[in-house]
Amino acid sequence: MNNQPQGTNSVPNSIGNIFSNIGTPSFNMAQIPQQLYQSLTPQQLQMIQQRHQQLLRSRLQQQQQQQQQTSPPPQTHQSPPPPPQQSQPIANQSATSTPPPPPAPHNLHPQIGQVPLAPAPINLPPQIAQLPLATQQQVLNKLRQQAIAKNNPQVVNAITVAQQQVQRQIEQQKGQQTAQTQLEQQRQLLVQQQQQQQLRNQIQRQQQQQFRHHVQIQQQQQKQQQQQQQHQQQQQQQQQQQQQQQQQQQQQQQQQQQQQQQQQQQQQGQIPQSQQVPQVRSMSGQPPTNVQPTIGQLPQLPKLNLPKYQTIQYDPPETKLPYPTYWSDKKADTDTLLYEQIIQRDKINKYSLIRETNGYDPFSIYGFSNKEYISRLWHTLKYYQDLKNTRMKSITSTSQKIPSASIWGNGYSGYGNGITNTTTRVIPQVEVGNRKHYLEDKLKVYKQAMNETSEQLVPIRLEFDQDRDRFFLRDTLLWNKNDKLIKIEDFVDDMLRDYRFEDATREQHIDTICQSIQEQIQEFQGNPYIELNQDRLGGDDLRIRIKLDIVVGQNQLIDQFEWDISNSDNCPEEFAESMCQELELPGEFVTAIAHSIREQVHMYHKSLALLGYNFDGSAIEDDDIRSRMLPTITLDDVYRPAAESKIFTPNLLQISAAELERLDKDKDRDTRRKRRQGRSNRRGMLALSGTSASNTSMNGVHNTVAAGNASSLPPGEILLPDIADIPRTFRTPVPSTLMPGGVDVGPSVESYELRNTTTYKSRPDRPKPVSPPCYIIDHIPGHSLLLSIKLPGKVNTKEEFAAAPNDTSSGTNAMLPSPESLKTKLNSNIRAGVTIPSIPNPIANHTVTNSPNPTLQPVIPGGAASKSVPTPSLPIAPPVAPHDSEATLLTNSNNGSSNNNTQNT
């Protein structure tokens, strides 16, 4: 076969070598030399590309025909066993209709090689033939598994041949796709090269045009500059001529004025000498010109002739600019620049005035103007005034025990909150002293997050009966097996505090609950599809039926749906959250639904792992599990029958207290029945044979059995989960009025009434003041009586008082002791261990000492004799620190009489 186009004999050998592989996948336009490629026109390139595509298509068609012709009929000694009755006539017809193979052609392309022999094609049923090839392969694989399970080798062989045929079709599609992609790539390369060449040509043209345009602009600018210079020179010459003419005219006018003045003076008479001005001669001797008339005159500007204008009643015709920068290249004159400056200044002033009055809209109402600043201050001041008045009113009402609105507003007055429009108070939800403070260690959290590859959520079910376990608790939760931050004991303790268990009961049952959780964690079988680390899209279509029967409070949710246990991308938590959002269910149902799904999926995973299933998409040998697996979905089974629509519809029932009690009793009865039967599955125990025991841990899937259950089983037998028994979920209501379905701790939420009671309590009497044991009284002459306290056993004091009447001094001063006697008293008191303050001479009349039996000696004014009077014992004052104050004990006297001996203590 000649792949070269016609007319190539006239082309040189170099060009013929370039196009020698045209029509093959290895041909590319990039192999054409650059010089030859630039010389070709776009039409020639398009013709080459079309010719290449035609030759390539014809080559592919010939290859396909040769493959079909070279396929020989099936031989007798290698033919498989006869397929079923439906597939036998199809195979016979295809075998008889195939002609004998023609001789293989010798002029094939060397890259094609020998084509493998293919069996006769098999016509698939229309239901399977309508599906895509990948789906056909999966359906045939399922049918083959079922045929293997039913031990039908004929059907297995027929399906195997059909699978090979589908596989060949898939490979042919891939080959066609690769060829098409190569063609598209070549087309794209051609288009890109053409676009690049066009861009290059355009850039060259633009550069040439720009260069020509630039040269023209320079020439025009030079011409304009020359014209402007000539025009300026002409204007300067004209101005000089005009100035000379003006000067000549001024001189002539001045001369005429002088002549007229002289003539007038001659007519009036001779000019007086005082008024005559002598002529000043210049240094050269010539008379100077008259300068006085031109001193106060300004030089006159030349008159400019205004240009003539013409009024046009129509728009001038539009003309095309020679180049875009025609007007901007011209130099603006002074008038234009000044006019633009004035316009710009007025525009800026206008905008500034608008901003000062209205402000900047994007920032606030009035922007950054004075009005905005004042209004903002006014609003802030008003807010603080209102806040102050509200708080002061609330504080005053609270102090007067008058119910008033809270400072913080009305708050929440919805479900479970009651009324908050009362006196401000803070009520914690849980007592602080009853809970432990949990201090989170950020380093542990970081290490846990770094070391954890994935989470293994274990479904935990807690069911404790009052008769058997001496306490009642039902709850379900998910526990992360890989989590090492929280201990099970701490979690159980916090959970029991939520359920308001007493301290003694809580400490008694913590170990029981922790042991139950640990046993369920040990019995947990991980997801084998995740542990095998198989890279797959989707699953093996192992669908089961999930049944939900959840009771939370007085609400019961009943539903069922299909779930693929082989697809590890299915997330029960996301499904539960989406379902509760659609049905508007509270958060208690989210965790309950996720737990129920994981629990039922775990039962199937564990049963298959214990039976030795390889989890590779093969057929399941166990009849009971295989019967519970749902069949493969086909085109006829896409829509669910109308009779099953009621079953696969969620039902949320409102149950009464009596119905809830009945369900609770049924649950207890089922629990006791299962406990009596030992939770045996549908076949009881599974005997481990030599073959099954070796397959229990294949592919790295480790199967774990609880130690407690394994110890009670006979040797060689294991306990399988009962997949027929779907547990019903009961949640113990949490004692809370905030969570829906909880148990009200106090009275009903709707039973609150606002009642105001006022009680008046009398103020208690003020306590009577207690007089101190000792007073310090100032000495008032004529109104007080000085007393001298004598210490027992002191002789010096008696002698001093005995010698007092013999003193020449009279009155009160005569009875005062001398300073020397005071020194002796102080010394004696210091020896006795009593501290006495220093007393000045003119004020101090006596000292106070701590004596068990002091004696009072009255001093009578007027020189009366002194007499010792026994007095009762006085309370002893504590010792005081020394200071410069007066410390005397005085008694008031009535008009100086000696009969009144009243003491004032």
From Swiss-Prot:
Q: What sections of the protein cross the membrane?
A: none
Region span, Disordered: 50-119, 270-299, 664-698, 847-905
| Ranges of Polar residues composition bias in the record | 281-295, 689-698, 847-856
Keyword list (alphabetical) reads:
Activator, Nucleus, Phosphoprotein, Transcription, Transcription regulation
GO biological process: any one?
A: carbon catabolite activation of transcription
- InterPro entries to which the protein is assigned, alphabetical: SNF5
Pfam families listed in its UniProt record:
SNF5
Gene Ontology MF annotations: RNA polymerase II-specific DNA-binding transcription factor binding
> Spans of biased composition, class Pro residues?
71-86, 872-881
Q: Where is the composition biased (Low complexity)?
A: 50-70, 270-280, 891-905
Quote the subcellular location field of this record: Nucleus
This entry carries the following GO cellular component terms, namely: chromatin; cytosol; nuclear chromosome; nucleus; SWI/SNF complex
Q: Which residues carry this modification: Phosphoserine?
A: 818
Q: What is its main location?
A: nucleus
Q: Where is the composition biased (Basic residues)?
A: 672-682
Q: Which family does it belong to?
A: Belongs to the SNF5 family.
Function, in words:
Involved in transcriptional activation. Component of the SWI/SNF complex, an ATP-dependent chromatin-remodeling complex, which is required for the positive and negative regulation of gene expression of a large number of genes. It changes chromatin structure by altering DNA-histone contacts within a nucleosome, leading eventually to a change in nucleosome position, thus facilitating or repressing binding of gene-specific transcription factors.
Mention any additional remark. Present with 217 molecules/cell in log phase SD medium.
Q: Assembly state and interactors? A: Component of the SWI/SNF global transcription activator complex. The 1.14 MDa SWI/SNF complex is composed of 11 different subunits: one copy each of SWI1, SNF2/SWI2, SNF5, SNF12/SWP73, ARP7/SWP61, ARP9/SWP59; two copies each of SWI3, SNF6, SNF11, SWP82; and three copies of TAF14/SWP29.
Official protein name in the record: SWI/SNF chromatin-remodeling complex subunit SNF5
